[in-house]
């Protein structure tokens, strides 16, 4: 599982509890990355974690998934603090049959999400102020 903009790491921990073997988490804010690691250690899950303290938008695919892709990619960008990034490039990191789930603002939906939804490439599920953008490879 690839957890982008990982924050507290709770989505990765949840994925592990549901059978994921390993989580690659990416969080660029040092204090958040530290808390994420402490959470995994508190649950004795640090052996199942690879943590990168990097900017998601400048990641190198070869560095993160040298042995292949991911079955699940989850991203929850801090869209209140930044323009919502175009995350479609991460779809190519999925294994066949994999799923990418990105949180996006329900208001001011990014243009690329609207385009992908209109084309039938993604499903968008709205939950109040947030929406889930779901892509299946």
Model regions and ranges:
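Class I S-adenosyl-L-methionine-dependent methyltransferase catalytic core
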Residues: 1-137
């Amino acid at each position: 599982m690839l957890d982008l903009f990982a924050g507290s790491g709770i989505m990765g921990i949840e994925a592990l509890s549901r059978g994921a073997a390993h989580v690659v988490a990416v969080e660029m804010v040092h204090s958040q990355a530290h808390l994420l690691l402490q959470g995994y250690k508190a649950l004795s899950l640090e052996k199942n974690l690879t943590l990168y303290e990097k900017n998601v938008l400048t990641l190198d695919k070869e560095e993160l998934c040298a042995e292949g892709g991911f079955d699940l990619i989850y991203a929850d960008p801090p869209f209140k603090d930044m323009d919502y990034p175009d995350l479609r490039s991460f779809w190519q990191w999925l294994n066949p049959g994999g799923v990418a789930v990105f949180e996006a603002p329900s208001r001011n939906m990014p243009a690329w999400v609207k385009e992908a939804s209109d084309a039938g490439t993604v499903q968008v599920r709205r939950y109040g102020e947030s929406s889930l953008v779901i892509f299946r490879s």
